[in-house]
Amino acid sequence: MTEKQRIVFAGTPEFARITLAELRQGPEAVVGVFTQPDRPAGRGRTLQASPVKQEALAAGIPVFQPESCKTGEALELLRSLAPDLLIVVAYGQILPQAILALPTRGAINVHASLLPAWRGAAPIARAIAAGDKESGVAIMQMEAGLDSGPVLWEERLPIAADDTAASLHDRLARLGGKALRHVLDDLWAERLKPVPQDPALVTYAHKLKKEEALLDWRLPAATLERLVRAFNPSPVAHTLFRDKGLRVWQARVLGAGGDQAPGSISAVEKDGVVVTCGEDRLQLLAVQPAGKGVLSGSDFARGYRPQVGEVLG
């Protein structure tokens, strides 16, 4: 009987958990999981295990959480697992070449963009914010650079006009798990043909910063609507209303109307307030006042009685 191929999986968030769950359905043996150390989360700031750790423990897979993989201890830990392949999905650490080279078949990465577009930490949100019409998953052979290795497999899907980072994330995660199965089957059969990335087409998906989510009403409404979707579920687009924070969870673009300054409420309609932008107007369909739950635009208009001419921001 042929021995099962030994896989070590390195990943941390929900996207990686979905990939790990799909991987576990295959014939390979997942002999260990590397994930980020437990971090404080929530209002109580209690330590919380990553989604990948929770999935691995439930499956009885050994879990390792080094603060850094650039130590000799991390290298020896990986060596002790004798992996045939290392699979990395949104792990959260840059892995040194010594780690990548240790498995007999090297290391591969599942990345949520059509490389070389959107290398880096936030490819899903950046694709939506930029107005891209399609996204996808690329699986690449890892090397020391940031998401720079040759592409082994690519799957595409359209970005819907109402896609948020959350909805696109879930579709890409499922797609990534299925694409990984194709890659593993071809890897063991030695059918893969790596394709180098074109350096001229590289773009970077830098990590999202909370200050980016503050809506600048001088921008076109179409740009702001994309940002609302790109920053949902985190860090969430926001503005100020009567000097208090107001999160914007859903919005839609309306045509120009009136000559109010950007940020001014130009109308209060049944579906929500309409705000003048640098170009066209934005209607706020779902908002969250500071310290409150999410309200529909109509409930917000009824409860807070915003007035035409009031300024947001």
From Swiss-Prot:
It is an enzyme of class 2 (transferase). (6S)-5,6,7,8-tetrahydrofolate binds at S113, L114, L115, P116. One of its GO terms (cellular component) is cytosol. Pfam families: Formyl_trans_C, Formyl_trans_N. GO terms for molecular function: methionyl-tRNA formyltransferase activity. Gene3D superfamilies: Formyl transferase, C-terminal domain (3.10.25.10), Formyl transferase, N-terminal domain (3.40.50.170). It catalyses: L-methionyl-tRNA(fMet) + (6R)-10-formyltetrahydrofolate = N-formyl-L-methionyl-tRNA(fMet) + (6S)-5,6,7,8-tetrahydrofolate + H(+). Its EC number is 2.1.2.9. InterPro entries: Fmt, Formyl_trans_C, Formyl_trans_C_sf, Formyl_transf_N, Formyl_transf_N_sf, Formyl_transferase-like_C_sf, Met-tRNA-FMT_C, Met-tRNA-FMT_N. It comes from the Bacteria. Keywords: Protein biosynthesis, Transferase. SUPFAM superfamilies: FMT C-terminal domain-like (SSF50486), Formyltransferase (SSF53328). Belongs to the Fmt family. Attaches a formyl group to the free amino group of methionyl-tRNA(fMet). The formyl group appears to play a dual role in the initiator identity of N-formylmethionyl-tRNA by promoting its recognition by IF2 and preventing the misappropriation of this tRNA by the elongation apparatus. PANTHER family: METHIONYL-TRNA FORMYLTRANSFERASE, METHIONYL-TRNA FORMYLTRANSFERASE, MITOCHONDRIAL. This is Methionyl-tRNA formyltransferase. It comes from Acidithiobacillus ferrooxidans (strain ATCC 23270 / DSM 14882 / CIP 104768 / NCIMB 8455) (Ferrobacillus ferrooxidans (strain ATCC 23270)).
